[in-house]
Amino acid sequence: MLDIDRNEKDAQEFDAYSRSVMTAAERVGPAVVRIDLEHEGRRSGQDNMPREYGGVGSGFIFASDGQILTNAHVVANARRVKVTLADGRTFDASLVGSEPDVDIALLRIGADHLPVAELGRGPLRVGQLVIAVGNPYGLNWTVTAGVVSALGRTLQAPGTRKMTDLIQTDTSINPGNSGGPLVDSTGRVVGITTAMMPMAQGLGFSIPLDTIKSALARIYQRREATPAGISLGVGGMRVPIDPALRQRLHITQQFGMELLEIRPGGPADHAALKRLDIVIEASGEPVTEPADLQRIVRRHQVGETVTLSFLRGGNLRKVTVVL
């Protein structure tokens, strides 16, 4: 049956709310991952022997070259981190870097051409529909829905300093949801699930996009990361391009790579690229995410040049970078 027939059938059988939740879950679902942890502790009792114990969390793929976002507390002190994709494949993951104060961690697995969770755009509003996808209590790919209850909340989470500017939702959040995406009705990520209020119902908290981007920039800056395009001295992430801007500038692609880190003294720095520039083309080839830029740059040698097209301040610009 054609998709249009299915859509017409859905419109007849489901209300608008149900269709929004279904669409969002189907869109982000392939990029959501299960994270299994192995820890080593001490067995209680007289022998006090080492023992292994596990845990489960969630995360999502934000770059097709295997970069995964989750909570820092999910992977803290883990001896082994195993990631299971929506298609059933499993990989050992390495910790690229973390920002415990804001509960963000960046993982990487040895895979590419992976489905990616798209990032949202525009401010959230109280009352807006949001959907959480994760693995509560190990129940894989569970979908729960609710609304944004409040913005800018402050929470004292165990083992961390006060977390600020959190999104409060009434979406059902349980152990195992941590690190999973909070998405809007279009299936775009607007936050990362981080905490619930113990002994309370309808109180969940998520980390907003601005905090996530700032944490990623700090991870890249510390060199714990290996940012895509390291020959250029940049790190970044896939972001949607504003539709009005695309139309005005006659840009056909929907995504670009937003620069979150410019290495001081590196090629991109010398070319006067800036944080929050959005690269859309390199050497005449489209750039929609870090993996694209990495692939293009790797074909060049030190001393060669790469011409970048990028967006800044609503304008399309070009610059030649010497590697």
Predicted regions: what they are:
Residues L2-R248, Q253-F255, R298:
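Serine-dependent protease modules
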